[in-house]
Amino acid sequence: MATVRGALVLLAVGLSVAVASASAPAAPRADASVFGGLGTWVDIYDGALFAAPEQTASRIAARGVKVVWVETANDRSAVDVVRPAELGRLVDSLHARGIRVVAWYLPGHVNHGRDIRRSLAMLSFRTTTGQAFDGVALNIESTRLRNVAVRSRRAVDLARRLRTAAGETPLAIVPFNPRGLERRPSTWPRFPWADLAAISDAFAPMVYTGGAFKGFDATYGYVTRALRLLRAQTGNPDVQIHVAGGVADRLGPEELAGFVAAVSDDGGVLGVSLYDWATTRPAAWRALKPVSG
């Protein structure tokens, strides 16, 4: 009888915890405006940019950029933060020019512990002057883990852990291009849009058209469809979006015009950029002027 009574007590406690958890209010969202305005991207392969961080920051500022997305590592990197000293100098130099810096990490979902550690490293990172990133982002695009169900669970768990640890630091998801997944759904069936939307503060889809879609109309239609799909898949017509086009040096004048027109006509995006800084030519910067805020 004592055993039964003890089991009932444990069951009651478990139920009360579950009910409390279910009824607990959702964590307040952080300020997504960090991801707003004209942006650009830097990845871990841009060694030349890190060789002279101050000059890089000066050139970025001259283009009127408001937010720089900087990759700290990916799941195959040898360390949790690549080039930390040079990265710190870049962050300090960008901040000195009034430019926000968002760190992003590309998880592979194969080694979940490593992905967790490297994601949290974005939050703990400090420059030599004590400065931190203004926001963090997870690039949920890797398909290295072939088990789709496990991949999705780990992606959502990783985002949830990072969101919990981030507090007031905003979190963005850099997802698969929604139009690309519509065209090739086997890439990531049942991508966890709604779960990630419930956790994050914004999305930054990389809506690449360069090389595959030629001309104004094809580019315009693709980008417009991608933005509509993102809102539909997340179930939130007001989801905060920073849209990234690209790859920058594969977009000709007509494609650039189509991308800019699609973003302008949409009228609901938070920010805009081309991937990436190293491949964005002067003509592309001029083309972005109408949507640079």
Task: Enumerate the language-model features and the residues they cover.
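Aromatic-lined carbohydrate-recognition surfaces of secreted/lumenal glycan-active proteins
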Residues: 40-46, 100-112, 155-190, 237-250
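Aromatic- and acid-rich polysaccharide-binding/catalytic face
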Residues: 70, 133-146, 188-221, 274-280
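Active-site groove signature of glycoside hydrolases
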Residues: 66-76, 122-152, 273
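Short, acidic/polar
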Residues: 45-62, 112-129, 184-196, 252-264
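Bacterial N-terminal signal peptides
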Residues: 7-20
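Substrate-binding cleft of secreted/luminal carbohydrate-active enzymes
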Residues: 200-201, 205-216, 233-293
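Boundary/entry segment of secreted carbohydrate-active catalytic domains
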Residues: 26-66, 71, 107, 247-248
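Aromatic-lined substrate-binding rim segments of carbohydrate-active enzymes
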Residues: 70-106, 146-173
